[in-house]
Amino acid sequence: MNLQYSPVFKCPPEMVTHCQWIYWFTHFELLAMIIEIPSFLLVIYATIKSPFHYNLNFIGLFMLLGYYVFLVGRFITCLYEIGSLTVKDEDAENEIYPMPLILSSILQFFYMGCACGISLAVAFERFFATYFVETYEKKKRKWISLFLCSEFTVACGVSAIVMLYDLLPFAVMAFLGVFISCASFLFYLVLFYMNKRRLHTIQQDRDNDVYTLSVRFQLSENLKVMTLLRNVVLFSGVNNFVMAIILTMYMSKSFKVSYPLATLYLHFAFNCCVLLYSFLMLIIIIFSVKQYRMYYFSIRFVRVVLYPLVGRCFQNEFSQSPVQQLTIRDETESYFVNLSSQWDEKFQKINRLSI
């Protein structure tokens, strides 16, 4: 049985100094997880208030809740690692572990599947947004997010069981995770350039009798969202690649026997990567695209929380008064009025020339 568990309160004499250092860091990790609970509530609030499509928001909230699942599992594991909760020596030798420790490992493995699949989930959501481009903003089509999240939950649950009971080598599972990240990134790029090329074709006044204003608007929105998701997918893929290498090494039984000290530090590095992954993903989501950055800064609660942290870096954005928030219908009508005025000017010029 493979557990995400590496006790540091009781180590061999030659590793006591190293274990003691990691022992105190684990206490810091517990504190960081307590701080992350309210900080990610801020992210959930911003996601609910975001101007994205219902399905994209739903998938984002699903992934955020998946991180809370990881926090629960990791918190319980940390208590076992520092000795607040203990495993009997004879039980550890016979690989008989308490149920809370087993469940906490399952929760952590489940989140690893979520981290690998987030890019694929948003890529498929953008696929449906591209396929139903004419009516995607008008109809929520909740079945898309429910279908993706349901399939995603089953896949992550199965992968967690496979990794826990070592049904497949960790190297195979790590390769599969990296492959999914790379494949979703390529799939995403194809969708991005499909939307970009189609919008460019429309803007060049080709097939004007086929395309409507709603198609123009939706393609423009798709490209804005994809600019943000491009950074998310790229960062997720790179992070998954690094974490896959670390996980494969320190979960290898032969590596544990040959390099116990390196295994201890790799386990420590993996946990650091998970913490950094969540914080950096938050930064990327909020600060990647100026339009969305301005939107998040217009939320009063977000401005109060983030100004002490990033106010100097984005003084121009924070110095502006919060923008008036429009509904999707208002934004759509404003966009259509602008396009209609441009078309009217063009047709007036054509009529003048014909006269």
From Swiss-Prot:
Compartments where located: Membrane
Pfam families found in the cross-reference section: Sre
Main location: membrane
Membrane-spanning segments: 28-48, 56-76, 102-122, 144-164, 172-192, 232-252, 268-288
GO biological process, one term: sensory perception of chemical stimulus
Membrane disposition: Multi-pass membrane protein
Domain of life: Eukaryota
One Gene Ontology cellular component annotation held by this UniProt entry: membrane
InterPro entries associated with the record: 7TM_GPCR_serpentine_rcpt_Sre
Keyword terms, alphabetized: Membrane, Transmembrane, Transmembrane helix
Family to which this protein belongs: Belongs to the nematode receptor-like protein sre family.
Identification of the protein by name: Serpentine receptor class epsilon-1
Gene that this sequence comes from: sre-1
